[in-house]
Amino acid sequence: MTPFSKALRCIQNSPAKQSWKTLGIMPKHGICLPLFSLHTRNSCGIGEFLDLIPMISWCRKHGFQIIQILPINDSGEDSSPYNSISSVALNPLYLSLASLPHAQSVAYANAKLRTMQQLSKLPYVHYPQVKAAKWEFLRDYYQYVVKIGALKDEDFEIFCEKEKYWLRPYTVFRSIKYHLKGAPVNNWPKAYTDIKNFTEFEKQFQDECSFFSYLQYLCFQQMSQVKAFADDNHVFLKGDLPILISKDSCDVWYYRQFFSSSGSAGAPPDIYNTEGQNWHLPIYNMHNLVQDNYTWWKARLRYAENFYSLYRLDHIVGLFRLWVWDTSGNGKFQPDDPKEYLPQGTDILTQILRASRMLPIGEDLGSVPTDVKETLVKLGICGTRIPRWERNWEGDGNFIPLGEYSPLSVTSLSTHDSDTLALWWRHAPKEAQKFAQFLGMFFTPVLAEEDQKHILTLSHKTSSIFHINLINDYLALCPDLVSNNLKYERINMPGTVSKNNWVYRIKPSVEEILTHDAFNANIADIFSKI
């Protein structure tokens, strides 16, 4: 039996079989693009929801079937999409302002929009300016829609009633935060940390709650429009749902019974970080989650299903076991016994699969126990393969042949947390030389465009079912489409607090990508060979 036949049998006998029906099991090809990095002529300083629509058309034209985005949840004052203040609510910063109904009715609308659109010409996302300008516009806009009675719109009322499980806690939390000038929860007056006063908070901040509810309604409308367009064009949207949530979030504030303050999640020491990492993210109270039948998780999934056909589960191994730091700075896996962590992970992932039609894709990079990887296969859940890291680490250290990847996987040359391919080639020449030899290529210290294209082509021909690369790695095929300093093509440096994290802006506009003859010819050439 071939590996593909084995994978097919696994899928057919797995809890994920219903999730696979929409996508099918034939090879799929896609791009990963951070929404904040996009810009069109209408974008107001940051990528916006409706900027995805022309990219969907481009994907269909060139043979890409998947667009993967990073998390788009509301991250409050933080620029990291992985440090959200809500596990469900979308980020109003991504609203396409120029496309809002009645946007032109805002005082000095055209002048304000033009000023914000100029921010898209900066080489990076300038969050302070973007946030100040967009929030001012949204508040002016909201005053107008209140004036014309839009809050009485039946669709808005239906939305608020349907989504009240997460929407009410989010809007109250957001309102208190605004009232306290963005202060983190641990600095709030004691009265605001007691959710027994929740109904009183709703009354106290009624107008603010309505404002934040209406913004979520607008986010829902625009992302639903994107999803409908993607469906019509046979392009699948892939979201990103981190398994952990910020301690400064409405989830931890309101659903505190599902979280534990006994420790914080992180990563154990390894060869790259001898002290390990403390992410300062709260851990779950698994007992209470189970007792509540995973209602909190199911609510996240059911809302995300409005927008995505599949999604990345960041740090999926954490659903089995987490590296937990105690208050004394000591760390250990919880639980540590396979007899505990395998049933725990299997149970929650089975519940997750039953809760929606979306297909989860596991981010299982780093040190993952073999029994966890085997369990993911039995569940019908794909893992992730980064060719430069796929090596026989327990043996001779050689690279694993591209044709030997499990079909139940996604191949990606780079991630948002790594160097792009061309940057890694320069930063790690010894490793890159070994990689070139493995691929049968002549090594040069600087990765030539033709070699970049060859490696991209190979990445689309691995035995994985899914092949999804960062748009940065495709843009590098044309030097005029990337920064002269390749370090600015990197999206994030994990474990650092840096002004360069999460500010990456794609150099060309979406309009320029669509009309760049040399770039599009390169994409066509890649697809002609796979």
Curated annotation (Swiss-Prot):
InterPro entries: Glyco_hydro_77, Glycoside_hydrolase_SF. Keywords: Carbohydrate metabolism, Cytoplasm, Glycosyltransferase, Transferase. It holds the Pfam family Glyco_hydro_77. It is found in: Cytoplasm. Gene3D superfamilies: Glycosidases (3.20.20.80). The keyword NADP does not apply. Transmembrane segments: none annotated. Coiled coil: none annotated. Belongs to the disproportionating enzyme family. This is 4-alpha-glucanotransferase. It comes from Chlamydia caviae (strain ATCC VR-813 / DSM 19441 / 03DC25 / GPIC) (Chlamydophila caviae).
